[in-house]
Amino acid sequence: MLLTEKIAVVTGGAQGIGQAIATTLAREGADVVVADLDAERCQETVDLVQQSGRKALAVSVNVGEWEQAKGMMDRVLKEWGRVDILVNNAGITRDGLLMRMKEEDWHAVLQVNLTGTFFCAKAVLPSMSKQRSGRIVNIASIVGAIGNMGQANYAASKAGVIGLTKTIAREYASRNITVNAVAPGFIDTAMTQHLSPEIKEGLLNQIPLKRLGQPSDVADAVCFLSSEKAGYISGHVLHVNGGMHMAS
């Protein structure tokens, strides 16, 4: 197994891609903290992790609030002693064309997607620095690389995540901490399953591989970047989007 006895924190781990990441890390030997605003669904992921024979802890948290992000990390360090892997997956959307976008929708998306990533990284880096090891994997998006109509706030937040990833990677390389990002494209989740056939066909036409990705595709990429096999990779954006990044 790639992650035997490692301790991982996965934000936004209650469902979808986050749940796939949490369960994949567990199958590779990691104990997993499932952090999410949705406490009930957190427990569902915890149950799946425990079915893999690993320890799991559910933490209800709003990562966009510093005291909550720090409190979560302090609790994990107190109860489990260390954090080896942080996956910043928590994210929201509030889509709308720029001229119609409400200011509160702009701020809400930036607060969770970008500031939340900053807060969680800031909270865990002192302990990772002390142990002189760690893996941080931030979930970005193809939208952060190429933009998308109706998603100015989301695109800005994910572009910010990419820049933040590269900066933290530079600042903490001397501490043997690697920091990378995974940029998913259109993934087959509950949201895409409710799209009309016409809209789904339009999405597929943008993807060179002509299929939606699976949550497991993203989870496998995160697992690799969290492992010793990726020990010489830092500051990288791994595109998991069926080739959309080159088609743009």
Can you say where each PLM-predicted feature lies in the sequence?
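Alpha-helical segment proximal to the catalytic Tyr-Lys
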Residues: 126, 170-174, 231
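Short C-terminal tail/terminal secondary-structure segment
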Residues: 146-149, 223, 234-248
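Substrate-binding pocket helix/loop in short-chain dehydrogenase/reductase
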Residues: 97-98, 105-110, 203
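Residue(s) in the substrate-gating loop at a strand-loop-helix junction
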Residues: 141
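The beta1-alpha1 cofactor-binding region of Rossmann-like NAD(H)/NADP(H)-dependent oxidoreductases
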Residues: 39-40, 60-71, 103, 216-217
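C-terminal helical subdomain
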Residues: 181, 204-229, 233, 242
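Active-site helix of classical SDR
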Residues: 121, 157, 165
